[in-house]
């Protein structure tokens, strides 16, 4: 089987969780290698419907080891709440099927507070943060001002490190934002409440993965968000603060030597976007509301309405290139079944010129979409499981996307359930 990465091609919310949940039966290990609790992976299976924000989507599969790698923004409070929600539905979670890298850094309460304070300061120039503390966390990590999960196992060192960090962080909270400084006792109580609970899951992931690799175990790398939200290759500064691309997976997982054989890029059959920033193909008014309702496009974390539009071939082709995708999973094709004509953004107009190249972020604000229309199929396709049974118009839509983005579409989802999938 070999190693595989499942990544987002666009702005996130493409349906990566349902693809990981589907494919994990063929893998031994699933690793979340970046990001934090700022986005949700929706999974529907025999246990129910879940929006996973930190837990890897392989947690429902018996015999699969799930790992939170060193690249993750580890929020002990929200992780523990998520563990409780999932186990309450009958899913076993133990140190045997969930492991946390001792090199993952902790997202602390002040990271969430700073996120909210900075968004408030930016006012109408805000980035549209989910206020889960992701940007302040990664800023601190690269300043070497965080606590690593492994430090929880060495309390005598932890106390000294916390005291030093707190003095430094309060300079920002009180001095820059005028907020109340955090007290050592408050932070200690938070650690005792949440961090103590996750200690049994913390281990040397590097050693575990090196042995797994030597034993021939197959690894599935699960990304958060998508290529257009990647810190380096996305629509900066309207990005996340980590690297959501497949090439970062070995580094963020704890196994830098890992080779990725297949990269499955997940693409929604239309475009959605949460947060601020350029969104060239955005729909408005009744047309947007109809698509949003048909696809139930509301944020898994925030519940806020997603911005929607037709599939953006220019952005999707760029995402495929950045991710070096070898296969595409096209999700939510069934949502478009209500349309007589299906809009597709094939090019951009920038100034007086038409382009099929994804522009530099500063240019995107002035780019205009070139829209073409394809025939719809106007029938329920949610029960179809074979390619040849799809309406001809649906096949042509998939084949058009495949040709334009230059990558084979090997999976097509026609519903939210695990088995609502066509494999080509």
Residue spans for each PLM region:
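Non-transmembrane, aqueous-exposed alpha-helical and coiled segments at domain scale
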Residues: 1-424
